[in-house]
From Swiss-Prot:
Belongs to the glycosyl hydrolase 34 family. The active site is at D151, Y402. Homotetramer. The keyword Calcium applies. It catalyses: Hydrolysis of alpha-(2->3)-, alpha-(2->6)-, alpha-(2->8)- glycosidic linkages of terminal sialic acid residues in oligosaccharides, glycoproteins, glycolipids, colominic acid and synthetic substrates. Residues 36-90 are annotated as: Hypervariable stalk region. It comes from Influenza A virus (strain A/New Jersey/8/1976 H1N1). This is Neuraminidase. Substrate binds at R118, R152, E277, E278, R293, R368. GO terms for molecular function: exo-alpha-sialidase activity; metal ion binding.
Amino acid sequence: MNTNQRIITIGTICLIVGIISLLLQIGNIILLWMSHSIQTGEKSHPKVCNQSVITYENNTWVNQTYVNISNTNIAAGQGVTPIILAGNSSLCPISGWAIYSKDNSIRIGSKGDIFVMREPFISCSHLECRTFFLTQGALLNDRHSNGTVKDRSPYRTLMSCPIGEAPSPYNSRFESVAWSASACHDGMGWLTIGISGPDNGAVAVLKYNGIITDTIKSWRNKILRTQESECVCINGSCFTIMTDGPSNGQASYKLFKMEKGKIIKSIELDAPNYHYEECSCYPDTGKVVCVCRDNWHASNRPWVSFDQNLDYQIGYICSGVFGDNPRSNDGKGNCGPVLSNGANGVKGFSFRYGNGVWIGRTKSISSRRGFEMIWDPNGWTETDSSFSMKQDIIALTDWSGYSGSFVQHPELTGMNCIRPCFWVELIRGQPKESTIWTSGSSISFCGVNSGTASWSWPDGADLPFTIDK
């Protein structure tokens, strides 16, 4: 075969290969068109998916940390029917507390992308429970985590994620710019309250379903602040309490009633010699009960109870089982402030049952270590220090921190009563440990009328991290 014949043969082969490739591409186009036509035809028949629920689940690995990006239920041809959370039921009768969630965020944060945060709290709608938290605009084990022991900065934001998940940029939802916050669901939408700005002129921004609906300007210009736990919704109205004034003396306290994020009523408490901060509030038979922190002068906790018209009663938990930290050793209680070792404090909670009270408190009387639940059958009204039950939550040797209440409504649980629950913040890092950062994880428990366990569920992270060395 001469040179010209070789060239002709090679050219012919190339031409044949090109034609075959072209035919294959045309075939692919035809198949894709047919597939699309079939799918389009199926979509024109809604009866195929009528009243069905299709679940899409996307997962990914980020820095070797498993993160569930979304788990969204889409009802074909249907929307989620809004309801109104009534809040008229009484608290469920309980005999103890069952562990509900633990996010292990500090342990996971040694390797994964986890927010530096504090002041976590939990709130539930009729469909889900979410963990809310105040970030520092930084991740664990990163240089921007340096100095995050500071409470108030322009970088702090309120965000939320599904309960029990470690809060990361991949599963968290932005809620508000805030260094003090609250949130709750009325059955139709999320209300968020985020306070930010300078100490002498902060502003609370109210959002309903993510849209700004109202604001509250600091009225004493001395660090306006709110609950750091969920607000309360009853029959379409939501309620919160705010403080403005000194943290170590008489301050000003206001109750607010809101509907769809708009303030419709507010009153200032007449409470001389009382100190209310960081109140943990819950609904009970159509009223709101708040148990708060006295940072001024008491070892026991103040409370305020009010109806939907903001008519209120005030007092201190009478029990000689004291709930604040630091505090005196248990002894003789008082239905006013117990002044011994009462300066400073920590956010906490209690649940009233008639004359009795479940008291959540640190095990240590002087530092934020350990946690326990105590049932005092007459502690709301009597001053002795006897109690009938104690359940261990965190060992004395392990760090705890803030704690607060949340509830699960009958519309979520299917029960005929409001289930009481609580969360505990497990603070790690500065100022007690050799790190450049301060952050926390959280655990939560819910009340049950069946078997429970006493144990310790600590944070468990091995410190310091690489960034700290």
